[in-house]
A protein has these predicted regions:
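Catalytic metal-binding/acid-base residues of hydrolase active sites
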Residues: 63, 90, 129, 164, ...
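Active-site-proximal segments of metal-dependent phosphoesterases and phosphodiesterases across multiple
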Residues: 173-190, 195
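Redox-cofactor binding/interface segments in oxidoreductases and associated redox assembly factors
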Residues: 39, 58-59, 126-128, 178, ...
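Conserved N-terminal glycine/acidic-rich loop preference
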Residues: 35-37, 47-67, 93-121, 222
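Binuclear metal-ion centers of metallo-dependent hydrolases, dominated by the metallo-beta-lactamase
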Residues: 4, 96-119, 191, 195-249
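Core dinuclear metal-dependent hydrolase active-site scaffold
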Residues: 1-52, 109-172, 183-186, 235-249
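Short internal beta-strands
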Residues: 81-89, 201-206
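Active-site metal-binding motif and surrounding structural segment of the metallo-beta-lactamase
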Residues: 42-86, 172-177
Length: 249
């Protein structure tokens, strides 16, 4: 499994069924690869709108830093065969949005406990959870689902969206993307979340609301206080601009 970070919470997940073949290495070809784009929002790299050959586009919740209608309209148009998997309130919001409403017949709402199978190499995406973390009691809550990506021969990926609730379905995940810093989180909540979920590997997302210096502080604390069995990895720093940064598992 390769995971490419296009900034903030946007992830391109490529799964090849545990063949070990990476791009350019031979073995499984692109036709054997399932590609899922998660949470392309307005803090992500604009270059992600040029992605094609996607098998699914999955959205954890409706906030624009995870679901940016101008980006989504381009992606939906460029990927006419892609499944569009949406937290239910997000499906309604995008159905009502003039930039994305024309694609509504392709929308598949994914409520907690529901799952969908996508791609030439079968991959299951399951929703868990249900509610966005509280920003302030005066702000109406919105739906949010953690997205669990599973395939035979691959490690399981959990993408939590905007929540630090350790739902039973995500405890013990092989690979976890965790919100590093947010208007709705505290450092001790992030550390407690990592300690309860106990992923084998965790990597940061939701980080463009912090300066580079601030991000480094949050990442240092996450690494220092994560459980011993959890490796907190960061994205490589040497990627070409606009191409995303990739970790392989």
């Amino acid at each position: 499994m390769d995971i490419t970070h296009f900034g903030h919470s946007a992830l391109l997940v490529s799964l090849r069924g545990g063949t070990g073949a990476r791009a350019g290495e031979g073995g499984a070809g692109e036709s054997d690869t399932t590609r899922i784009l998660i949470d392309p929002g307005n803090l992500s790299e604009p270059s992600l709108t040029h992605l094609t050959d996607l098998d699914a586009i999955a959205i954890s919740h409706q906030h624009p830093d995870h679901a940016h209608p101008p980006y989504l309209a381009e992606l939906f148009a460029h990927n006419s065969e892609a499944a569009i998997l949406l937290e239910p309130q997000t499906a309604q919001a995008l159905s009502d949005n003039p930039e994305t409403s024309r694609f509504r017949e392709r929308f598949t709402p994914l409520a907690p406990g529901q799952r969908a199978s996508v791609g030439p190499f079968p991959v299951t995406v399951t929703a868990a959870g249900g509610t966005h973390a509280t920003i302030h009691p005066s702000i109406p809550p919105v739906g949010n689902v953690a997205l669990i990506v599973e395939a035979a021969g691959e490690k399981t990926l959990v993408h939590t969206g905007d929540s630090l609730v350790p739902h039973p379905e995500i405890v013990g995940a092989d690979v976890l993307s965790f919100p590093l810093v947010a208007p709705w989180s505290k450092m001790h909540e992030t550390i407690d979340f990592l300690r309860i979920v106990k992923p084998a590997v965790a990597f940061p997302v939701h980080d463009r609301v912090a300066s580079a210096e601030g991000r480094a502080i949050y990442l240092k604390q996450s690494r220092a206080f994560a459980p011993e069995e959890c490796e907190v990895r960061d994205w490589p720093a040497d990627a070409e601009p606009g191409q995303g940064r990739t970790l392989s598992f």
